[in-house]
């Protein structure tokens, strides 16, 4: 589990650190105390050159997982790797269900943070398949990144509701 919404992380920094970094430590400890052989941490594209607290905590989490390969050493076959991908289409808190809800409510316009704002997208099925393939390929210490498309939020809004207007609302904290 992770605290994954950028603006929520900015307003609740201690909870974000506790959840994302403390959670990573807990998973590593649990794996070391059991007979688990492989652990893949699910991360985010925002962990690469982070510009917000969410990305920074996920980068730290990634480093905890990767460095845990050194802690285990040759003591056992436990290996840690990371998968970083973008937004899962339709996931909780992402823009697709937000836009869908506004459209279903009969709203006349969709909020757009910035016309230049983009997101990387992956379907749930694609993300699961990529993680499973990463398990097969992992040796320990890798950061796997799928090649996935990006789309401007304004283009997504146009595709979902071509007749609705857009209202530029500005970037949220951390964006």
Where are these regions (language model features)?
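A short helix->loop->beta-strand "cap" motif at the edges of active sites that frequently abuts
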Residues: 34-38, 76-78
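Terminal hydrophobic/aromatic helix or amphipathic segment near a protein terminus
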Residues: 164-175
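Conserved catalytic-site region of short-chain dehydrogenase/reductase
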Residues: 33, 45-50, 88-90
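NAD(P)-dependent short-chain dehydrogenase/reductase
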Residues: 53-54, 59-138, 149-153, 157-163
